[in-house]
């Protein structure tokens, strides 16, 4: 049995690394900046699909802080992006980040499917509209917040992304922002509870 488990682990690692290499060498889009497709454990039981990749350090730090505050075990998490590129546009003399186009989303969908097939997580956490629309095209994120859906046959929890949270700061009250932060944290904890109920945290 141990030999079989080692074989499965090695095969999973090879598959995930293969997808990662495809993303790093992808030329489907003209985007200059790309991130690795994953961060975390290849033996993950929880796959977290974030919005498109970002290089905003404040967003990255706040997201990591929420993960650290949650009941999730870092050894159980694999984190990927719905779109692996940092999508940008020029605004006068500066370059700012933008939402990915439908074409860019479509180009990355194959990589998401391959990661899910390779890792076979017990549960998925989908954060943000971009992640949701990769699996339920044309959907309105607000209608799916705090719901459970099924992506590629796997139970999936839906919520805002941390990037959404930062964008909402300009027209939401502090109390509303705190409520959304708590909601995202609750989603992480719900995934941890799901694993406990499934007996997969041993």
Please tell me what each predicted stretch does.
Residues 2-202:
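A polyanion-binding, active-site-adjacent surface
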């Amino acid at each position: 049995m141990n030999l079989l488990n080692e074989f499965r682990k090695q095969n999973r690692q090879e598959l995930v690394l293969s997808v990662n290499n495809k993303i790093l060498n992808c030329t489907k889009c003209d985007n200059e900046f790309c991130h690795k497709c994953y961060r975390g454990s290849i033996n993950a039981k929880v796959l977290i699909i974030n919005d498109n990749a970002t290089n905003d350090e404040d967003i990255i730090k706040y997201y990591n802080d929420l993960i650290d505050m949650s009941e999730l075990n870092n050894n159980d998490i694999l984190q990927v992006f719905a779109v692996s590129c940092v999508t940008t546009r020029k605004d006068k003399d500066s370059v700012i980040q933008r939402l990915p186009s439908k074409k860019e989303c479509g180009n990355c969908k194959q990589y998401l499917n391959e990661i899910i097939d390779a890792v076979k997580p017990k549960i998925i956490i989908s954060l943000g509209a971009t992640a949701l629309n990769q699996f339920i095209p044309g959907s309105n994120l607000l209608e799916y917040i705090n719901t459970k859906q099924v992506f590629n046959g796997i139970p999936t929890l839906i919520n805002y992304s941390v990037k959404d949270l930062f964008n909402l700061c300009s027209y939401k009250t502090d109390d509303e922002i705190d409520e959304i932060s708590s909601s995202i944290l609750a989603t992480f904890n719900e995934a941890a509870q799901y694993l406990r109920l499934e007996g997969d945290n041993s």
